[in-house]
Swiss-Prot record:
Keywords: Cytoplasm, Hydrolase, Nuclease, Ribosome biogenesis. GO terms for biological process: rRNA 5'-end processing. CDD domains: YqgF (cd16964). One of its GO terms (molecular function) is nuclease activity. SUPFAM superfamilies: Ribonuclease H-like. One of its GO terms (cellular component) is cytosol. It holds the Pfam family RuvX. This is Putative pre-16S rRNA nuclease. Residues 141-161 are annotated as: Disordered. It is found in: Cytoplasm. The lineage of its organism: Bacteria, Bacillati, Actinomycetota, Actinomycetes, Micrococcales.
Amino acid sequence: MRLGSRLAVDVGKARIGLARSDPHGLIATPVETVPRDPAGSADVRRILAVATEIDCAELVVGLPLALSGRATASTDDAEGFARRLADATEIPVRLVDERLSTVSAQGALRASGRGSRKQKPVIDQVAAVIILQHALETERAAGSPPGALVPRNRVDPDRHA
């Protein structure tokens, strides 16, 4: 298992959930929910600020695939966002399969007694925790980093497609 804190990113249409691991990769905890900024780069800047605050060794972006494994519009959105992150930082960015993370997060919150109205502010953070915990467990079991490394094409984070 590689050492260093990881920051998980659950990309949604309106919000982005963040979760972090401890430096030993044993546990994932929620951090915050960042508003999506489709017209600018405030979301990328905030995520990179959090990554700097926690001395992040790697960013783990959830890749929402259909149950069949096929790409969806959400898959394309997450891949594009991961590229924006990779282009704006030296921190490695990985895409990891996140099938059913939001469904699992909803179930966990429901089981904890949170109704759907109370879930909204934290659902994205809980999904990010599930994504990160899965990535950490996968790395421990396989002995290699999970998912796929996103290639970097350095650009100004304020300039994106």
